[in-house]
Amino acid sequence: LLKHILQYIVFLALLCMAVCLLVSVRIRRSSIQTGIYGGQKRRGKQWGRNFMLGVQFFICWIFVTLTVSLFLQSGKVTETLFHTLSQEDKETILSIPLDYPFLENKEKQEMVERFRQHVGVKDILLSDISYTHGISGNLLMTEKGNDNSWIDINVMCVPLNFFTFMNIPITEGRTIRTKKDLVMDEVWQKRQKKDIIGMNFYDQTSDFTVCGVCAPFQTDVHNHNGGYAFTLYDSSEYIGHCYVKCYPEQQKEVMKWMETIRREVLPENISSQVRTFQDDLYEVQAVEYILKDIISFFAIVSIIITLLGVYSSITLD
């Protein structure tokens, strides 16, 4: 879609240049009296002016249509990404990066414990990576020690409270409890066309057994989603990101509290500003939002030019 939009913009720009060139040539060859009152042969038949006005309406219609389609698309994508969370949830969850090499994991844990002390904090979710910027792995084996049995699947290491925090329902079986448990989402299950509860999978160091199936987990709309596998995450080894769910009425106070803690712990050259989960999603859709703003600007300009053209036509008549 983005490629097609860019092609439309280039086409419209070339069309506008061609129209402007033709109008300029026409004006240079016409006298002022002829331009205002029309020649004897064409008086009362302002086909040229009407044609130009039609072109203006056409260009205006294209830009307005593109603007509406981009607004609808961006809204649909926002709803699709992490669709188990409501819009309010996305706006009240704070996203805090902790992947700083100069911090020991113990220091990160102490920072998280200080986060918990605020009464406005409802729950905290720890992760090894930001959910909008990657996954924990992408391969599992169906046969132990068989390098030819690797399958391509998105692997996420998640803590025990992941499914409740993200509002992801378990549709079959149960959630993860130990490091040997594995939960698959429905996307991967449908690809197998069979019951996967009890199936065994392996990586280089561990073996897993599927204990449950959850609702689809959607983190990207541009790339093919082959399904997700969820294993237990151990935050004592490494913390790369922290998500904090707040009570809506206390979100601003929680943000100030966490920004104060970050200023105390982090160096001055690192921003202490705290973002929301919705801000992370906007960053993922940055290109779409930029295009939407550009097309919206051109749509407004084309509407103004079209209205001026209609006004001038009425005035001349």
Model regions: which residues?
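"Rare, low-scoring activations can occur
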Residues: 105-107, 112-123, 186-193, 203-292
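Short amphipathic alpha-helical segments
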Residues: 90-96, 180, 238-242
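Short beta-strand boundary microenvironments
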Residues: 113-197, 206-235
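A hydrophobic alpha-helix feature that marks transmembrane segments and, especially
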Residues: 21-24, 298-317
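Residues within membrane-spanning alpha-helices of integral membrane proteins
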Residues: 53, 57-60, 66, 154, ...
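Short extracytoplasmic
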Residues: 92-112
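Alpha-helical transmembrane segments of integral membrane proteins
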Residues: 1-99
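Membrane-helix entry/capping segments
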Residues: 1-7, 41-51, 265-301
